[in-house]
């Protein structure tokens, strides 16, 4: 995706990346997943956002970068969460990637997540392999070493196509049935907890 693609406001970007491919490369490995769940955080006036009240700290600096930069933060002291800066520089809106669907390298994803082969997983484990922000970061080996880097780099990027095991280009769909709901686990955000800024496809 080109730079301008990520300069949308947070809500538009959260919708636009649904159905696109999140691709992770490391140690000569390539993992392809499809983005199926996102949340928008709309900057300094959003009580659910880390930058509410224009709180610019060392932690939130990536959100003030131009759209298309990676913001990884830790929750509960152990789980990484992947976000993308949206809009333009110094407009700190972002998108949290909440869920992805594994497309390729299922064993690699499974080893990262559960330390066993994909064929050894229970139905419950398969269902829950990447359906949460901390889960997908563990499955894709996403950590804070990627913080502030471009989502258009070599290590982690978003694309509207990938190459299958036969070398054929597979493109994302343009027509999607996007669902909306309240964002998850932000009960502290007063009226903002009721905003319908969570987006997902089934």
UniProtKB/Swiss-Prot annotation:
Stated family: Belongs to the DNA glycosylase MPG family.
Keyword field: DNA damage, DNA repair, Hydrolase
CDD domains from the UniProt entry: AAG
GO molecular function: alkylbase DNA N-glycosylase activity; DNA binding
Species of the source: Clostridioides difficile (strain 630)
Protein name per Swiss-Prot or TrEMBL: Putative 3-methyladenine DNA glycosylase
Keyword Ribosomal protein assigned: no
SUPFAM superfamilies: FMT C-terminal domain-like
